[in-house]
């Protein structure tokens, strides 16, 4: 039943200790016990993914890299567009999640999709360049997220697309045209998410905007499951390599 599956997920998110000597071990410790029930709960928890992936142009014969792509559920949001791509890579450090992704690709018959267990700050596609790089609620879980963005910049072709959807908190004094978050939002969500090693940052968007030409930006909020009184801030960013 969905309720009991949710309770198992919430146990792992809120109470189960996260152990490991490095980031890969901590990721597997966190996700290993919830991998089977991951997609249904995250579909309700992580908003904006479907809209982001459907909005991005699918270049014919192109290379798409989904960094921190986990179970590969994001790729389903490409719909028929996946068949237009030459190669899709889902890169993650959790082998439990990648196993589900590999099974998903096999079931759909997506022979051009491949899972890669690797570090998002270092891995590069064997083709040498990518047309699209996406991060879906993964930047906040990458300790060196600056390095992950710089790695994406290196692998993208000139004019290539980067697209990010994630939690965030706004700066106290944001740049002109960006949303300002109040004291509660700026001081509640960072420690709230930090218990799961998720770190919403006021610096994601300014850094992305400094490194890429902004194509589209949406700043919004949504209600989390079982937390009806609070709305969590998130953003969708699409940029182009300058």
Predicted regions and their residues:
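Class I SAM-dependent methyltransferase SAM/SAH-binding core
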Residues: 63-122
């Amino acid at each position: 039943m969905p309720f009991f599956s949710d309770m198992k997920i919430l146990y792992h998110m809120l109470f189960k200790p996260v152990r490991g000597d490095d980031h890969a071990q901590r990721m597997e410790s966190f996700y290993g016990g919830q991998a089977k029930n991951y997609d249904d709960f995250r579909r309700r928890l992580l908003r904006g993914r479907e809209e982001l992936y459907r909005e991005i142009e699918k270049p014919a014969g192109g290379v798409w890299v989904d960094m921190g792509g986990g179970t590969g559920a994001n790729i389903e949001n490409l719909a028929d567009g996946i068949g237009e791509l030459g190669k899709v890579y889902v890169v993650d450090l959790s082998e439990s999640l990648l196993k589900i992704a590999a099974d998903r690709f096999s079931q759909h018959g997506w022979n051009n999709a491949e899972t890669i267990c690797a570090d998002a700050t270092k891995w590069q596609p064997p083709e040498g360049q990518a047309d699209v790089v996406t991060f879906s609620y993964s930047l906040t879980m990458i300790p060196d997220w600056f390095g992950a963005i710089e790695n994406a910049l290196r692998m993208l072709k000139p004019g290539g697309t980067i697209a990010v959807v994630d939690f965030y908190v706004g700066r106290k004094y944001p740049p002109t045209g960006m949303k300002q978050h109040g004291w509660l939002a700026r001081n509640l969500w960072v420690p709230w998410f930090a218990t799961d090693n998720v770190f919403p940052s006021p610096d994601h968007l300014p850094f992305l905007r400094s490194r890429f030409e902004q194509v589209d930006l949406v700043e919004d909020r949504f209600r989390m499951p079982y937390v009806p009184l609070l709305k969590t801030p998130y953003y969708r960013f699409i940029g182009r390599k300058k």
